[in-house]
């Protein structure tokens, strides 16, 4: 689990910077070449936060006069912020809603990942689920509160919950369970609750260094064909690399596999935003795989 971000995901400096108005310009350097300078702000999905940090670090190395501030608070917050002109770019882990498009939101696909069902590694139900897989019907019953398991969902408006709900044919507000803020919060709750089951973005379900499931958490396999058993071609959860390959090949269902987006309010005019988006969708794609994401 990406513990290094927990202390900084809620409070960032993006609003402080945005209050002064975002700046960006292209100027001439001492050698006569064009130099990009200024700063931009991003807010939104926990799912994209770790990858966005890597993109920002490399972009800053390429353009030392550019600063990028990033904060995570859920896809819903990102959309709200960008449409209110509080940030330049929203990180969004779901499809845009019609009303968001009507307000001028423009989405740029930048990566692909998935939401997975997660469970306490010592949950008594886990052994059976390894044999049968979790069918859509079973998952629906769990998040309707019809089982004895302790069910967790998200309390914040987020792409992960909307994506998992879409897999069940529902909306986020239909999901029953204990609401917890953020991906790290759900993962920590499951680690402490032997009877717990929930869902996470894959970046928090797996350890980013070992690519194995996060300590104390297990990944619940999906019975994709609904035949009541986990077939050989449905077994791809042991490592993050196996799951990423399954997502890329379409073996893991969509939803809960999904595209991830950077979103702007209308066509961006800030040259730093324009160049950053170009970078992310071209050279920046090489960082997707090592970070646990599928490139577009």
Give the predicted meaning of each segment.
Residues 1-5:
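Positively charged n-region of N-terminal signal peptides that target proteins for export
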Residues 20-72, 76-83, 92-96, 101, ...:
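Exported/periplasmic ABC-transporter solute-binding proteins
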């Amino acid at each position: 689990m990406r513990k290094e971000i927990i202390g900084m995901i809620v409070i960032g400096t993006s609003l402080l910077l945005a209050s002064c108005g975002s700046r960006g310009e292209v100027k001439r350097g001492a050698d006569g070449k064009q130099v990009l300078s200024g700063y931009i702000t991003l807010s939104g999905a926990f799912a994209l936060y770790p990858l966005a940090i890597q993109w920002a670090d490399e972009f800053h190395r390429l353009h030392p006069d550019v600063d990028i501030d990033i904060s995570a608070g859920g896809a819903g917050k990102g959309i709200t912020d960008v449409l209110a002109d509080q940030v330049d770019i929203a990180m969004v882990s779901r499809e845009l809603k019609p009303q968001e498009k009507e307000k001028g939101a423009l989405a740029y696909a930048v990566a692909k990942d998935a939401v997975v069902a997660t469970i306490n590694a010592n949950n008594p139900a886990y052994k059976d689920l390894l044999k049968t897989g979790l069918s859509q019907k079973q998952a629906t019953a769990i998040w309707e509160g019809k089982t004895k398991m302790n069910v967790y969902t998200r309390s914040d408006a987020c792409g992960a919950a909307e994506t998992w709900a879409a897999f069940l044919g529902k909306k986020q507000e239909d999901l029953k369970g204990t609401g917890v803020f953020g991906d790290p919060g759900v993962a920590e709750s499951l680690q402490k609750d032997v009877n717990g089951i929930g869902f996470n973005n894959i970046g928090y379900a797996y350890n980013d260094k070992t690519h194995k499931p996060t300590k104390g958490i297990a990944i619940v396999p999906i019975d994709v064909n609904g035949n009541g058993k986990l077939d050989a071609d449905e077994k791809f959860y042991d490592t993050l690399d196996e799951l990423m390959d399954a997502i890329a090949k379409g073996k893991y269902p969509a939803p809960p596999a999904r595209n991830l987006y950077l979103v702007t309010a209308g066509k961006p005019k800030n040259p730093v935003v324009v160049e950053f988006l170009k970078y992310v969708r071209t050279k920046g794609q090489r960082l997707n795989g090592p970070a646990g994401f599928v490139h577009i």
